[in-house]
């Protein structure tokens, strides 16, 4: 029979999993998410998380505790009498007492091929590191940082054209299907768990804005992966002086291109920029305070002459 589930998640990445579980007949008895944050044009309105919005649309009770470490929070969690909890980018550490509360445990959807890229930013780090593949895994949670036993996995190739946004969306959809399959196996009593490998562990540290500046002295492929790994947020950037004005541009998409010159130098009329070995051609960018735009549209209004230099 269908499982009684607690769902715990916050951002857009978690929404497909919530919708798929609800659509497959499981009884989602409560949704835990982060509290609404100030937003809107003046920051005066409280904006709910994407998960809260979807849960309320589905008529599921929503809880937004500041902590799960109090006796009151634990008692409330236990009172749901859930078979299992599904956790997708919740953003809060679950203490052992919470992990032990559901009859069959807590199951996390993680956007990497564990034990590679444990931590906060696995999608960004996989692209930035030049990884050939990524994926999603369902693991039974323990108190460690993404150290639980793995139940299921799905792999996905990373192409040079993929941005963090592209990979995020693909893994979100694949992960939703994977979690549905995992919960079906759990319901049947046939979910097999495998310990993570002890070697190959890497950590996906949170992305800092200080990392975003582009280093044109690196090889072109590394520059491309850096740009795509930070697109759209926080956005890899560089500055160039045009008509005496220093202009900061976020580079959102690019492609490998032919060209040589001093790193950072514009080598043609199509925004091809020299790197250490060859070049990249910018295809999408964003000027400060403006909307993202195709490079071709930018060049219609702004001349970036060969010989100018990004830095």
UniProtKB/Swiss-Prot annotation:
GO terms for molecular function: methionyl-tRNA formyltransferase activity. InterPro entries: Fmt, Formyl_trans_C, Formyl_transf_N, Formyl_transf_N_sf, Formyl_transferase-like_C_sf, GART_AS, Met-tRNA-FMT_C, Met-tRNA-FMT_N. (6S)-5,6,7,8-tetrahydrofolate binds at residues 112-115. It catalyses: L-methionyl-tRNA(fMet) + (6R)-10-formyltetrahydrofolate = N-formyl-L-methionyl-tRNA(fMet) + (6S)-5,6,7,8-tetrahydrofolate + H(+). GO terms for cellular component: cytosol. The keyword Protein transport does not apply. Keywords: Protein biosynthesis, Transferase. Its EC number is 2.1.2.9. The keyword Transferase applies. Belongs to the Fmt family. HAMAP family: Formyl_trans. Attaches a formyl group to the free amino group of methionyl-tRNA(fMet). The formyl group appears to play a dual role in the initiator identity of N-formylmethionyl-tRNA by promoting its recognition by IF2 and preventing the misappropriation of this tRNA by the elongation apparatus. This is Methionyl-tRNA formyltransferase. It comes from Bradyrhizobium sp. (strain ORS 278). The lineage of its organism: Bacteria, Pseudomonadati, Pseudomonadota, Alphaproteobacteria, Hyphomicrobiales.
């Amino acid at each position: 029979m269908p499982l009684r589930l607690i769902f715990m998640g916050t951002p857009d990445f978690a929404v497909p999993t919530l919708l798929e579980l609800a659509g497959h007949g499981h009884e989602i008895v409560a949704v835990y998410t982060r509290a609404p944050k100030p937003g809107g044009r003046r920051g005066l309105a409280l904006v709910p998380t994407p998960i809260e919005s979807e849960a309320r649309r589905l008529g599921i009770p929503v809880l937004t505790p500041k902590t799960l470490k109090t006796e009151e929070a634990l008692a409330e969690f236990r009172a749901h009498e859930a078979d299992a909890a599904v956790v997708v980018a919740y953003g809060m550490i679950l203490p052992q007492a919470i992990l032990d509360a559901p009859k069959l445990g807590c199951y996390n959807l993680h956007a990497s091929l564990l034990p590679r890229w444990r931590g906060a930013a696995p999608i960004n780090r996989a692209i930035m590191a030049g990884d050939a593949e990524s994926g999603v895994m369902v693991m039974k949670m323990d108190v460690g940082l993404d150290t639980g036993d793995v139940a299921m996995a799905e792999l996905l190739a990373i192409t040079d054209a993929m941005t963090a946004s592209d990979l995020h969306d693909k893994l979100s959809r694949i992960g939703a299907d994977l979690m549905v399959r995992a919960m079906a196996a759990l319901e049947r009593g046939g979910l097999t768990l495998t310990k993570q490998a002890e070697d190959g562990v890497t950590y996906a540290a949170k992305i800092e804005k200080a990392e975003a500046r582009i280093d044109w002295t690196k090889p072109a492929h590394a520059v491309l992966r850096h740009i795509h790994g930070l697109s759209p947020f926080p956005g890899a950037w560089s500055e160039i002086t045009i008509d005496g004005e220093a202009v900061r541009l976020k580079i959102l998409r690019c492609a490998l291109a032919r060209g040589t010159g001093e790193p950072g130098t514009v080598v043609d009329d199509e925004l091809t920029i020299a790197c250490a070995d060859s070049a990249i051609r910018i295809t999408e960018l964003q000027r400060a305070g403006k909307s993202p735009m195709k490079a071709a549209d930018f060049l219609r209004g702004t001349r970036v002459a060969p010989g100018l230099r990004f830095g």
